[in-house]
């Protein structure tokens, strides 16, 4: 699973760099509001609930935390929004945790796909049928 996590980190950071370059900071409040919309927020909470009790090794946790901090700082330096930075870094943690736990949660795969499509997830997400691992491996080959 280390390879898949490496690929996730690489694609997530690369996509986020492009997202932040293209982001109109005047839209941050709208993005935050859309993420607080019931269906998005509830789906996020449900996905978190599925991995909340999962146990990861110290190395896995440290690896996720390191990238999460990098994502937070990168986002904050471009947006000056601690709320958006927290949301995006927590999204990375959620996606990485589901990947390491090898779960099959189509909403989390859709969350990841939205980032890889260089968009900040909000509102309703386009459904992705592959597992998260399958999705990342397809991206790694492209």
Kindly give the residue locations of the regions a language model identified:
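C-terminal alpha-helical interaction appendages
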Residues: 12, 40-142
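Membrane topogenic helices and adjacent juxtamembrane segments
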Residues: 1-45, 138-139
């Amino acid at each position: 699973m280390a390879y898949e996590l490496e690929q996730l980190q690489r694609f997530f950071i690369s996509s986020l760099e492009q997202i932040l370059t293209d982001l109109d900071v005047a839209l941050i409040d709208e993005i935050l509001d859309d993420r607080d919309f019931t269906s998005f927020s509830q789906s996020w909470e449900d996905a978190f609930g599925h991995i909340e009790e999962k146990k990861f090794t110290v190395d896995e946790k440290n690896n996720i935390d390191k990238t999460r901090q990098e994502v937070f700082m990168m986002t904050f330096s471009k947006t000056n929004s601690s709320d958006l930075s927290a949301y995006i870094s927590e999204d990375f943690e959620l996606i990485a945790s589901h990947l390491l736990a090898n779960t099959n949660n189509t909403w989390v795969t859709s969350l990841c796909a939205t980032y890889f499509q260089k968009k900040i997830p909000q509102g309703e997400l386009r459904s992705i049928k592959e597992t998260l691992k399958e999705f990342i491996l397809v991206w790694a080959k492209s």
